[in-house]
A protein has these predicted regions:
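Condensing-enzyme catalytic core of the thiolase-fold
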Residues: 1-261
Length: 261
């Protein structure tokens, strides 16, 4: 790791966060506003200031962007950071998301037809899947170009071979539902950007909310993308009996909203 003052030059910050009850409570607290001022309360609690505040506190002088794409925020932040590194806009980057539930005005609420499971358990891709559960978490990656990391002797935990971003537009059954076509395109484009074929895959970490609608659509999109591949052959030419695992960490930590990527 790096101490803030020893961070690589031009370190960018690409992060996003979920709205919190704490921010709402602090923003409407007249005593707090009287103590430090309404503007300071907003700066310290409003998620739009997250990236520049981190850059300021750590003394990082690269691009600083607060990203907001709902549940895909943290993964979109990683994509933007990767692109910035490849374009030479920064030499290192912090990328990720945060969702922390602190002050709760009510307990766990389930209602018929909603996204939350009736028993408070999330079971992605399971026959008993009936919904997701809210979760809290922070996920941040320190990203560098591989050649720079190796040259400086940095520990390399993983290599990002390729990323892609798409958007469903109106091509889905509802605003909060995923769409098959653009999810398929995102997977295919990511494989192409990585210069790899689906046959190389051993495991897929999916969004996997544990909802009947979302899991089914995600499985269909992954199946379509893996069947086609980038060479038209797909994962099927791995050989008969081959399998690709699929799962989601939400079964352990729940849906972390802006940090779910």
């Amino acid at each position: 790791g790096y101490a803030p003052l020893n961070a690589p030059s031009r370190t960018g910050v690409y992060v996003g966060g979920s709205p919190t009850e704490h921010a709402l409570a602090a923003g409407t607290d007249p005593a707090l506003a009287a103590s430090i001022g309404a503007l300071q309360v907003r700066i310290l609690t409003d998620r739009e200031f997250l990236a520049p505040w981190i850059s300021y506190r750590l003394g990082l002088d690269g691009p600083s962007m607060t990203v907001q794409t709902a549940c895909s925020t943290s993964l979109t932040a990683v994509h933007l950071a990767v692109q910035a590194l490849l374009l030479g806009e920064c030499d290192a980057a912090l990328a990720g998301g945060v969702a922390i539930g602190t002050v709760r005005r009510q307990g766990y609420v389930h209602y018929q037809g909603g996204i939350f499971s009736p028993d408070g358990r999330c079971r992605p891709f399971d026959e008993k899947a009936a919904g997701t559960v809210p979760g809290s978490g922070v996920g941040v990656l320190v990203l560098r170009r591989l050649e720079d990391a190796l040259a400086d002797g940095d520990p390399v935990r993983a290599v990002i071979r390729g990323t892609a971003v798409t958007n469903d537009g109106a091509g889905k059954v509802g605003f909060t539902a995923p769409g098959v076509d653009q999810q398929t395109a995102a997977i295919t484009e990511a494989w192409a950007a990585a210069g790899l074929e689906p046959s190389a895959a051993q495991y897929v970490e999916a969004h996997g909310t544990g909802t009947e609608l979302g899991d089914r659509i995600e499985l269909e999109a992954a199946g379509t993308a893996f069947a086609g591949g980038t060479d038209g052959r797909g994962a099927g030419h791995r050989g008969s009996g081959s399998r690709i695992g699929i799962g989601s960490v939400k079964s352990n930590i729940g849906h972390a909203d802006a940090a779910a990527g």
